[in-house]
């Protein structure tokens, strides 16, 4: 069934209702914060946001006698939006409740546009983006490349992870091997694992230890199964593949941070089927394709669009085999998806 199209007035009413609900929630939250701050609160200390629940977040104490304990915290009204991975200053109250008083500067942030096109951070202080894909659902180079552009744009190290490699057979092996070869040639780290059978999981754990990582990828590629294998004590519900579409069903409902014994952390975030890049410019996308770096600025025309222009350095590199057709197709698809002002 086709998705119902809403007219302008219906959209306005929906936004008005959502705005009123948000205002009421903010008022209740402000009253709760005032009540807490009017009581007995502990001294200011550092904490780590490990989960987000609407107007409240879960904060783990990182130092002092409360280290390792988790508190459900309210936010002061003047604070910016917080996400999992944020480092904060907070004060503890009674019965596992606290108040966040300040957000500490972020080293990195992973953002994507929301349904209204506004840029929204989804994770903070991430060191590595693990791009998960699998033989089923069939991997798409375009989606992988979108994640890579996002990683390059955010200054976060990417790791390509092929899960369920035990499902590789004679039919899908040639295409998968060709796909992986492109990224290995570019110098991107690639791992092949099976969360179900345990193959390659030790190598993955070594990559994750000592870093804050986030798993991204379309639903059904086994992100929750990977978490269950890496952290058996954590129960992350696993969703089956849809028999009709071959796509996965979303299981994780909120971004949550988990600790590894080796000192690293993992942020398990909701599955993302189509990763939006509407917040980046053409120059950002071009910079996200690392094989373009030595070619950009060497075209005959300064405003070259790398389409059919004579003297285009990228087209010459494509012809010579220095740029793969698969990557050029992804680049053109991403550029075409940008809003006009992104050009």
From Swiss-Prot:
Short name of one Pfam family for this protein? Answer: RsgA_GTPase
The biological processes this protein is annotated with in GO are: ribosomal small subunit biogenesis
Cofactor remark: Binds 1 zinc ion per subunit.
* Keywords, alphabetical: Cytoplasm, GTP-binding, Hydrolase, Metal-binding, Nucleotide-binding, Ribosome biogenesis, RNA-binding, rRNA-binding, Zinc
Q: Which HAMAP family match?
A: GTPase_RsgA
| Cofactor(s) required for function per UniProt | Zn(2+)
- This chain belongs to the protein called Small ribosomal subunit biogenesis GTPase RsgA
Name where it's found.
Cytoplasm
Enumerate the residues binding Zn(2+). Answer: 299, 304, 306, 312
State one molecular function term (GO).
metal ion binding
Functionally, this protein is described as follows: One of several proteins that assist in the late maturation steps of the functional core of the 30S ribosomal subunit. Helps release RbfA from mature subunits. May play a role in the assembly of ribosomal proteins into the subunit. Circularly permuted GTPase that catalyzes slow GTP hydrolysis, GTPase activity is stimulated by the 30S ribosomal subunit.
Residue span(s) of domain CP-type G: 116-275
Q: Which InterPro entries match?
A: G_CP_dom, NA-bd_OB-fold, P-loop_NTPase, Ribosome_biogen_GTPase_RsgA, RsgA_GTPase_dom
A Gene Ontology term for the protein's cellular component: cytoplasm
Q: Is-annotated flag, keyword DNA-binding?
A: no
- Annotated EC: 3.6.1.-
Top-rank taxon: Bacteria
Quaternary context: Monomer. Associates with 30S ribosomal subunit, binds 16S rRNA.
Organism, as annotated: Pseudomonas fluorescens (strain Pf0-1)
Keyword flag RNA-binding = yes
Chain sites annotated for binding GTP: 163-166, 217-225
Q: Which SUPFAM superfamilies match?
A: P-loop containing nucleoside triphosphate hydrolases
Q: Tell me the protein family, please.
A: Belongs to the TRAFAC class YlqF/YawG GTPase family. RsgA subfamily.
């Amino acid at each position: 069934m086709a998705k119902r199209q809403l007219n302008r007035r219906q959209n306005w009413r929906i936004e008005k209702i959502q705005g009123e609900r948000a205002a009421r929630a903010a008022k209740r939250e402000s009253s709760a914060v005032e009540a807490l701050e009017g009581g007995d609160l502990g001294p200011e200390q550092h904490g780590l946001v490990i989960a987000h629940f609407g107007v409240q977040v879960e904060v783990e104490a990182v130092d002092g006698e409360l280290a390792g304990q988790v508190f459900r915290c309210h936010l002061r009204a003047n604070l910016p939006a917080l996400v999992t991975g944020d480092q904060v200053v907070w004060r503890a109250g009674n019965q596992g409740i606290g108040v966040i008083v300040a957000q500490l500067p972020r080293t990195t942030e992973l953002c994507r546009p929301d349904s209204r096109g506004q840029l929204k951070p989804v994770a903070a202080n991430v060191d590595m983006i693990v791009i998960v894909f699998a033989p089923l659902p069939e991997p798409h180079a375009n989606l992988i490349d979108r994640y890579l552009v996002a990683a390059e744009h955010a200054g976060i190290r990417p790791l390509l992870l092929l899960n369920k490699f035990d499902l590789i057979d004679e039919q899908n092996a040639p295409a998968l091997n060709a796909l992986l070869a492109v990224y290995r040639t570019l110098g991107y780290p690639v791992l092949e694992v099976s969360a179900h059978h345990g193959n390659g999981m030790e190598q993955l754990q070594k990559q994750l230890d000592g870093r804050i990582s986030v798993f991204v990828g379309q639903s059904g590629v086994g992100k929750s199964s990977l978490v269950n294998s890496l952290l058996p004590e954590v129960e992350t519900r696993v969703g089956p593949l849809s028999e009709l579409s071959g796509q996965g069903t979303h299981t994780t409902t909120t971004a949550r941070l988990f600790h590894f014994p080796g000192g690293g952390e993992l942020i398990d975030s909701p599955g993302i089927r189509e990763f939006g890049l509407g917040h980046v410019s053409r120059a950002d996308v071009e910079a996200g394709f690392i094989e373009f770096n030595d070619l950009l600025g060497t075209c005959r025309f300064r405003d070259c669009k790398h389409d059919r222009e004579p003297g285009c350095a990228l087209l010459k590199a494509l012809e010579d085999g220095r740029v793969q057709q698969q990557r050029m197709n992804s680049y053109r698809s991403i550029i075409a998806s940008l809003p006009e002002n992104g050009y």
